């Protein structure tokens, strides 16, 4: 069988200079456009530092960023023209990403090169040089914490939106202004062997999977300042309007460092179903497996399978906060707000009717083969096994736990839960405080062993 030869389009042949000074946006886009016009091809980025604004990859194009090559985001807001997109659960106008794949199919973005977002400008714009100022401080003082992320509009590094048959492989992502990799409204996407690091800024999520189907994430190493890997499905009234779930998601064989762990939510409006998470190493993350939502999100999260997690120095191995971060989660126009407000403020503040439609449902979750260890004098030593709070009217239910060993500082708490089964679950604690239980029905508790005396004891109502 004769293999069809893949035509190559080297960006330096179109005028790109890898000197870290010359703006190469137009040259890179010309190479991509030429490959697309030829019916497809490989756009190659040789070694060098290529300063660029937003580029748009087209169907049947492979963008190959070679070893020693850096695509470096130019620090210029005008270089990222606004596009209609979903971001953080809302459809609105937002700066385009550095690399955009929108409405395309058969695209590969690969190589051993680096995508550098030069995010410090955007981080400082958001929260100042000391993380206490910037737009965040100004907005929070006015009761607008919920709006600041949506007004700052920091670019993502890679956006795959409304696409099918896309692969992202081998690259290193650093210093993202906002999320690193966003997979939205897409299907048949593979993300593998990425390294995501040097993301000290706010909301620098590693990989976000948003209202997408048949997505595989594997063999990635992620260190960031928010959720390492997150599955989302829209926010509040706008997310319920769109009503697109994330379904058939596989996350496996990844190593996660600093960050929020593996998260479902808080954008849950379209529903999240059939998610398989396995063979994950978590080292020093804030959370291990995390569920979060809010009273206006809605959606059903079900058929979730989690197995073979190994956590070291993780503060909250299991954090299920379904009324998460109210100052961010609930959009409310301030009293006395006069004059014109941004259109996306109105979208965010639109109430959910009837109100009970906004209460999410979490059910049918299996968690097995988990170990939690660590240095109890570590910075994350105030660890607790369970951080769980759902809703009195809609408890988190039908959770099956098996073959789990945790060594933590405290037992923690479980509020508003129903039908939890535990098989071979043992928790070793430093503090003798019992597991606090509130409004639980038919909920098994682990075997607890206090490290001070080695005796087993079980949780009590409190």
Label each region the model flagged.
Residues 1-462:
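Extracellular/periplasmic carbohydrate-active domains that bind, remodel
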């Amino acid at each position: 069988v004769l293999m069809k030869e893949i035509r190559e389009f080297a960006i330096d042949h179109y005028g790109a200079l890898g000197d870290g000074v010359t703006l190469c946006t137009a040259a890179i886009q010309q190479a991509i456009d030429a490959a697309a016009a030829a019916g497809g091809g490989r756009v190659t980025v040789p070694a060098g530092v290529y300063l660029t604004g937003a580029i748009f990859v087209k169907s049947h194009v492979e963008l190959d960023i070679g070893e020693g090559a850096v695509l470096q985001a130019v620090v210029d807001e005008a270089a990222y023209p606004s596009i209609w997109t979903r971001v953080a659960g809302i459809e609105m106008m937002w700066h385009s990403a550095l690399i955009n794949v929108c409405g395309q199919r058969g695209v590969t973005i690969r190589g051993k090169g680096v995508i550098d977002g030069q995010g410090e400008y955007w981080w400082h714009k958001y929260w100042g040089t000391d993380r206490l100022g910037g737009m965040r401080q100004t907005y929070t003082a006015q009761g607008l914490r919920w709006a600041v992320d949506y007004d700052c509009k920091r670019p993502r590094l890679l956006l795959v939106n409304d696409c099918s048959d896309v692969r992202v492989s081998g690259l290193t992502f650093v210093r993202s202004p906002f999320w690193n990799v966003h997979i939205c409204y897409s299907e048949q996407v593979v993300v593998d062997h990425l390294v995501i690091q040097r993301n000290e800024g706010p909301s620098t999520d590693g990989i976000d999977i948003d209202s997408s189907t048949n997505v595989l994430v594997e063999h990635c190493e992620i260190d960031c300042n928010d959720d390492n890997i997150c599955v989302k499905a829209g926010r509040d009234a706008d997310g319920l309007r769109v009503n697109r779930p994330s379904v058939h998601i596989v996350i496996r064989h990844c190593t996660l460092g600093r960050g929020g762990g593996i998260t479902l939510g808080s954008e849950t409006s379209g529903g999240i179903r059939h998610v398989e998470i396995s063979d994950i190493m978590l080292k020093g993350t804030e959370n291990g497996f995390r569920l979060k939502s809010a009273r206006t999100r809605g959606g059903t999260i079900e058929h979730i399978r989690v197995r073979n997690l190994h956590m070291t120095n993780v503060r909250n191995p299991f954090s299920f906060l379904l009324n998460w971060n109210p100052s961010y989660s609930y959009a409310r126009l301030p009293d006395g707000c006069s004059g014109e407000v941004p259109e996306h403020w109105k979208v965010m503040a639109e109430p959910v009717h009837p109100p009970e439609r906004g209460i999410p449902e979490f059910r049918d979750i299996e968690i097995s083969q988990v170990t939690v260890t660590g240095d109890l004098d570590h910075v994350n030593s105030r660890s607790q096994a369970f951080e769980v709070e759902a809703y009195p009217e809609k408890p988190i239910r039908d959770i099956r736990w098996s073959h789990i060993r945790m060594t933590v500082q405290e037992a923690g708490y479980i509020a508003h839960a129903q039908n939890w089964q535990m098989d071979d679950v043992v928790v070793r604690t430093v503090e003798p405080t019992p597991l606090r239980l509130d409004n639980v029905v038919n909920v098994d508790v682990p075997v607890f062993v206090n490290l001070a005396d080695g005796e087993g004891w079980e949780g009590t109502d409190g």
